[in-house]
Amino acid sequence: MANTKSALKRVQISERNRLRNKAYKSAVRTLIKKCLVAVSAYGANPSPEGLESAQQALSEAYSKIDKAVKRNVLHRNNGARKKAGLAKALQKVSQAS
C-alpha cells in the first residue's frame, strides 16, 4: 500500500482514470460492433436506407474514436487503425453491392 499522502492520492487518481478509460473503451467497442452489424445488414440487403444507416453508425463510431484519442484513452495510431478497418468494411460491402 502507499506510504505517503501523495502516493495514496496517485493511487486514487489512477483508479479513477482507469474506470473512466474503461468506460470510454467499452463505448468505443460497442459503437464499432453496431457499425459492423449495420454494414453486414447493408451487405445482406443493399438498399439506400441500409447504406444511410451504415454511414450513420460509421459516423457515430468515428466520433467516439476521435474523442477517445483526444482524451488519450486510445493511442492515435490505434484510433486510426480502428477507423480504417470500419471504412474498409463499408467500402468492401459497397463495392460488392
From Swiss-Prot:
Bias (Low complexity) ranges: 86-97
SUPFAM superfamilies: Ribosomal protein S20
Domain of life according to the entry: Bacteria
GO molecular-function term, one example from the UniProt record: small ribosomal subunit rRNA binding
A biological process from GO: translation
Bias type Basic residues, positions: 76-85
Signal peptide: none
Annotated segments matching region Disordered: 76-97
Recorded GO CC terms: cytosol; small ribosomal subunit
Key words of the record: Ribonucleoprotein, Ribosomal protein, RNA-binding, rRNA-binding
Pfam families associated with the record: Ribosomal_S20p
Family in the record: Belongs to the bacterial ribosomal protein bS20 family.
Biological function: Binds directly to 16S ribosomal RNA.
Record protein name field: Small ribosomal subunit protein bS20
